[in-house]
Amino acid sequence: MTISTRFRWMTTAVLALLFSVSASALAQNATITGKVLSDGGQPLYGANVVIDAMQISIGTTAAGVYTIVIPGARVKGQQAVLRVRAIGYVPQMRTITVSAGAQTINFDLKTDVNRLNQVVVTGVAGATEVKKLAFSVAQISSADQPVAGSNPLSQLQGKVAGANIVSASGRPGAAPSIILRGPQSINASGRSQEPMVIIDGVVSQGGLADINPQDIDNVEVVKGAAASSMYGSRAGNGVIQITTKSGKSSSEGIKFRANMEFGTSGVENEYPFPKSHIMLMNEDFTRFCVAVSGVPDCGRTVDIYAEAYRINDQGGDFALPPATFVNDGGIARNPGQVNLRALYLSNPFPKVYNPVRQFLTNGQVYNGTVDATGRVGRTNFFVSANQFRQEGSVKLIDGYMRNALRMNIDQQMTGNWNFSVRSAYTDAIDNNSGSAFFRVTRQPANATVFARDSKGRLFIRTVAQQQGAQNDNPAYNSENFRPRNRISRFVGNLSSKWQPLGWLDAEFNVGYDGRSNFAESQQDRGYRTTTSSTTNLGIIDRSSARSYALNSAATVVMRRSWLQNALDSRLTLRSSYETSDSRSQGGGGTNLAVAGLRDPDAAITNFYTTGGTEQIRALGMLADVNLDYKGRYIVGGLVRRDAASLFGASQRWQTYGRASMAWRVSEEPWFKVSKVSDLKLRISEGTAGNRPRYSAQYETFTIGAGGALSPSSLGNKDLRPEVSREMEVGVDLEVMNKYGLTVTFANNVINDQLLPVTPPAAAGFGTQWQNAGELTNKTWEVSLNVPIIQTRDLNYSARINWDRTTSMITRLDIPETFYDGNQQGAETMYKIKQGEAFGSMWGRRFVKKCSELPSAFQSKCGSGLEYQKNADGFIVYTGTGNTVNDGITKNLWFTRLPAASAPWGVDVLGWGLPILV
C-alpha cells in the first residue's frame, strides 16, 4: 500500500469516526416542541413553558410555538412535569418522559377570568397560586395597565380594594400617597403611614417617583399584618412589591418595542373667585374713592388699574405705597362701623380678570420608551431607556424631567444553578416652586399677574389694595426665583439560586438602593419687594444629600410530599441583614456681594451650614411552614425575629408571627354545586411592626448662641416598635367559571403607639417618645369581577371594588390633646382622645335652643326677649326691645355685648350673630 493510499484510508476513517460521534451526540439530545393556544384557538405569545425539576424555562413565540432542547448529558429517560402558564389563563401540566429524540406536546389553555391560578410571591415564602392563599394579596399585572401612568402608584388607583390613594399635589413629578386599610400610627411624624415598598427584591428607600412605570411587569399588594408578617418590623403599614419585566418568557431572539406618548396636562373646572368688592366707588363705578383725612368720601378718586401701574413703574427695587381706598378691608384690617351699610360684596370691578386662569396653561407631557426583550442561548434579558417630561399647569415653571435606564439579565449557568441581575439608573430634574399656585389663588379679580411696567419688569405688586404679605406677584416670583433639585438614583439586585436536589433550593440575594440629590435656590440681590423700602440684598441656599441602603438575604427551601403525595409540605428558613446610611449637608447666607453669582461664597452675612448623619442596622431570622393536603386544606405558620438599631437599647429584639388556614370547599368530594366552580374560606392572624423614628430613642439637644446646649428630647432605652396584630377572615367565590366575588373583613389592633409625651419638669427636657396608646382599624372589602363580553377577538370585564375602614383610638396613656395634622390654622381641629374616631374634626357649634343656654339666660330667651331665634334657626343676641330684623333699621350691626354680660362669660357677642357653645 502506497503512502498516499494509506493516507486516504486514514482520512476516511477519521471523518467517519467524527460523523459517528456527532450523530451519536445529536441522538442523545431531547427536543420537546409544541404549540400553546387559547381556548379560542389563538396562539399565545409569551406563555411560559417550564420543567421545574430541570430548571428549564422558555417562552412561546408570536405563533405560540415553543422549543426545548435538553443536552444529552441530562437525558436519562426520567419522568418530568412539563408546565405551561400564561397570564389570564388556567395553567396546564403534562407528565413526560425525557428521552432522546423529538416529541411534540401541544396545549390548549382555558381563560381564567378571575385569575385564581395566578402566582403571587409577596407575603409567602414561595410562589403560590391565588386559589391556595390563606389571606388576600392583590395583584395588578402589565396586562391590566396597557397604558402606563406617570408613576407606579397611580396605576393602582381604583383597582385594589382597601387601598386609599390620594394625589395631594398636582405638582409635576409628585407621587401620590397611599394608605392600606387605614392609618397605623396616631403620630407618624418623622416616619410614614405608607407601606413598605420592594422593587425586584430591593427594599426601597427613595420612593416610587423615580421608577419608570413602563418597566413594570406586575405589582402585588399586601394590605395588613395578617399577610405581611414575614417582613417583620417594617411591614405594619402593608407591603407593595414591584416586579419589573425580564426575558424569562421570551423565546430565542430579540423583540424591540418603542412607545411614544404626547399630551397636555391642565386643571379641570374653574377656581371660584369674587368678581365684586366692598370698596367705595364713584357713581358710575369706574373709579375708586381714596381715603384722605379731612376730605369727604370720594372727594378724591383714582383708576385702580393706573394706580397699580404707578406703584410698580415708579418704584426701584421695591413697589411704592399705594393710595388707601375707602373700605379697603384687605386681609387683616377691620372697617369702621360708620360705613357698615356699604360693606356688601356688591360693587363690580370695572375690569375683571381671572387670576388663576391667567397663571395656568396646558403644559405638555411627553413619555417615550424604547426597550428590547429577548433570549440568546441561556441568557434572557430586558433593557429599556425612557424619558418623561411634564411641564405642569403653571406658567414660567419648567416642571419635571426624568431619564431612566434599565437592564435586567437572567443567566442559566448549569442545570441547577442560575443567577439574575436587576439594575436601574434614574436621573431627574425637579424645577418646581411650591408656593406659586397658592399665592395666585389669593389674588383679587382686578389682578393682572403678567402686566409689565415701562422697563419690561413684571409687576411685583399686582394690585393696589391692602393685601398684606400676600400682595406679591406669584408670576414675578416664578420668573426670578428658580429653585432646582437634581436627583440621581441607582437600584440594583443580584440574586442566585441553586437547586442541588429536587427537594432542596438555596437562594441568596443582595439589593442596593442609592440616591443622591442636590438642591439650590437663590433670590438674587435686587429682587423686588412690596413691603420694604430698601433694596433686597438677596439670599442663597445650597444643600446636598446622599443615602444608600443595602439589604441581603439567604434562603433555604425544603419540600417533601407525604401520604402517597396527598400532603405537600414546604419549610423555609431565611436570614436577612439591612443597612441604611444617609448624610446631608448644606449652606447659604444673605447679602449677596454680586448679583447673578450662583455660589454660596457670594453671601456676606448670616452665613450658615447644616449637616446630619443617620445609620440604621437591622437583622432578621425567619422560619415558615406550609402544608397542603390534597389541595383542599392549606395551613401555614411562620415565626420571625427582628433586631433593629431603631429600637430602644433594652428592646433590641422583637418577635413576629403568623398562623393561617384555607379550606377549599369546592374541592371536597361531597360538594356537588355545579354552578360554583371555586369556593374558599380563609382565616389568617399575624403581627408586624412599625419602627420608631431615628431620633426617638436618643437624648437630643439644640445648640444656641455661643454653643450653649439646650435640652430638647429625653431619650428612652425601653422604646419598642408599634405592633400591628391583624385577624383577617374572608371568602372567595367563583361562579360558572366567570363571576368572581371576594369578601374580606380585617380587624387590626396597633398597640404600643409611639407618641410624644411631656416628661416631669425635673427631667429638664420638653418631650419624650413613649409607647402610649392603641389604635384599632376595622375594614370591610368587597370585590366583584363581572365578565361582560367574552369572544375570540374581544374580552371585556368590569371589576367593582368597595371598602370601608373605621379607625378608633381604643387606648390612650397620655392626656387627650389636639394636633394640627400639618394643616395651617388647624391647631385645634383634630383631637387625640380615647374612644374617639381617629381623624375626627373638633370644633364649636352654634346654639339652636334656649335650653342650651346657661340656666340664668334661659329666661331671657324667646320672642321679644334679649335672645331670639333667627331665620336660620340659630339663637342670636338682639337686646331688649329689638327683633332679629332691626339690624339695618336701628343700625345695630357690629354692636357688641361685653363678654362679662354674655353667656358663659367668655366670648364677646356680636349683635345678630350666632352664639358659640
Report the location of each language-model feature:
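Short, acidic Ser/Thr/Gly-rich low-complexity loop/linker segments typical of extracellular
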Residues: 55-65
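N-terminal, post-signal-peptide soluble/periplasmic segments
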Residues: 127-128, 133-148, 152, 159, ...
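Short acidic/polar hinge/loop motifs at secondary-structure boundaries
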Residues: 66-67, 73, 154, 200-227
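Conserved small-residue
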Residues: 257-344, 770, 789-916
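Cleavable N-terminal targeting peptides that direct proteins into the secretory/outer-membrane pathway or into
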Residues: 1-31, 76, 90-92
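Short, polar/charged loop or turn motifs at beta-strand boundaries
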Residues: 35-39, 135-158, 166-170, 178-188, ...
